[in-house]
Amino acid sequence: MTYKSGFHIGSKKIDIAEKPYFIADIAANHDGDIERAKDLIYLAKTSGADCAKFQHFKADSIVSDVGFSSLDNSKMSHQASWKKSVAEIYDQYHTKREWNDVLIETCKDADIEFMTTPYDIDAMDGILDSVNAIKIGSGDITYTPFLKKISKLGKPILLATGASNIEDTIT
């Protein structure tokens, strides 16, 4: 099997002979504060990142208090001190879709790529023209209908494999 060598994300060539593509994974570390999100974009650029990446999800579509409470260890060590439920925390700290235009403009101003990890196809609404690549989280590696839809968008896909096994990655 042969593979095409290299591709571009914006103006940056991604290839084995090139410098690594540095993604600042801001995710939800803005703590639900758009000003903090903007500050993190500028900090990412100052740190030498090529890209500022966020996560776009809606809490009610990826977490459930019922699901977490049914686990033997419903409060993992880092969640034991939370005063709110897992679903409430996710809802509070998600990247709000109404922030998209501001985040995209801030990335342009900082001269850094904007990227996201969408957790549903609707997350791409309104930002498809502003991303030059899409990152898929490893938890979605076996979510075939989602991957097929994303692959039809015509953008390079960075597919995480951390929460998968070898069979997941080759099928």
Language-model features: locations:
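Active-site-adjacent beta->alpha loops and helix N-cap segments on the catalytic face
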Residues: I34, R97-N100, I136-G154, L158-T171
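Catalytic domains of carbohydrate-active enzymes, especially glycoside hydrolases
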Residues: D39-K58, S130
